[in-house]
Design a protein with these regions (language model features):
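Beta-strand-turn-beta hairpins that frame and shape the catalytic cleft
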Residues: 29-32, 47-55, 80, 84-111
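Short, P/G- and charge-enriched loop/turn segments at secondary-structure junctions
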Residues: 7-13, 76-81, 217-221
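Extracellular/periplasmic catalytic domains that process cell-envelope and extracellular macromolecules
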Residues: 15-19, 83-86, 98-102, 152-155, ...
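Acidic/histidine-rich helix-loop elements
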Residues: 65, 73-77, 117-125
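Metal-dependent phosphoesterases centered on the DNase I-like endonuclease/exonuclease/phosphatase
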Residues: 113-231
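Active-site surface patch of divalent metal-dependent phosphodiester/phosphate bond hydrolases
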Residues: 1-64
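A Trp-anchored, charged/polar loop motif used as the substrate-binding/catalytic surface
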Residues: 70-97, 134-151
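Short, solvent-exposed loop/turn and secondary-structure capping segments
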Residues: 9, 34-39, 108, 118-122, ...
């Protein structure tokens, strides 16, 4: 966007500072000293990242001035600076007292951009924002946080990925395979992602019927637009 022209004049989309951001309210203590943020992590530094291109070409009026179908969305100079996270990625450890002592559960929170509303860049960024957490739980060494600490989640740590990820593992306009790969990873509790503990609701199934939805898992829908995007 153009400097001073909302909502596209910053790293993230918004009509005011903090729009579409998120907050955490916890019954248990948040380990703020060991909370990590990744707001400044650059997209180019994600393993496998490439400059997104214009791939949705049915409406050329949406193309940036002077660009055509197939062009790279960013110049090389822009790509060197652009951030991955459209809002923030946060690892907040929660300290939970148990009869055997304190147990730590890492809340991996984010709100990726929707895979829509432009000509292909958002599709790629949404997938990359979700893939970041997949690589994070694999403790990839290239990851760095906003304080300069490197590496991801240490082996054996408990975690919950949460937030509006804007990506359904089996339906929608996003790159569903990215969420499928995360769900299928042995590091993730398979009873939750592919088994009996997956959150479902009667309301979701009723909504699917009301909207004549073709979603293959209608009782998992979390949004009024008929997709399972919240975790």
């Amino acid at each position: 966007g153009n400097a001073g022209t909302l909502p596209g004049d910053a790293w993230g989309f918004g009509l005011y500072h903090g729009q579409y951001a998120f907050a955490l309210m916890s019954k248990y203590e948040i380990d703020t000293a060991n909370t990590r943020t990744f707001q400044e992590f650059k997209w180019k530094d994600l393993e496998g990242a490439t400059i997104p291109t214009i791939t949705v070409c049915d409406d050329p009026s949406k193309f940036p001035t002077g660009m055509v179908c197939g062009d790279e969305w960013y110049t090389n100079d822009e790509w060197a600076e652009v951030r991955l996270s459209s809002k923030n990625h946060v690892d907040a450890p929660i300290l939970i007292p148990t009869k055997d002592g304190t147990e730590t559960v890492h809340l991996l929170m984010s709100h990726p951009t929707p895979p829509a509303f432009d000509v292909g860049k958002n599709i790629e960024q949404n997938a990359a924002e979700v893939d970041f957490w997949h690589q994070y739980i694999q403790n990839k060494s290239f990851i760095y946080d906003d304080s300069g600490k490197t590496g991801g989640l240490e082996q054996g740590q408990h975690f919950v990925m949460m937030g509006d990820q804007n990506l359904d593992p089996v339906d929608g306009d996003g790159i569903s395979s990215v969420m499928q790969d995360l769900h299928n990873d042995a590091l993730v509790n398979q009873d939750v992602t592919n088994g009996s503990l997956y959150p479902t609701s009667y309301g979701a199934a009723e909504h699917a019927v009301d909207k004549s939805s073709s979603h293959p898992q209608p009782n998992r829908i979390t949004s009024t637009f008929g997709l399972a995007v919240d975790y």
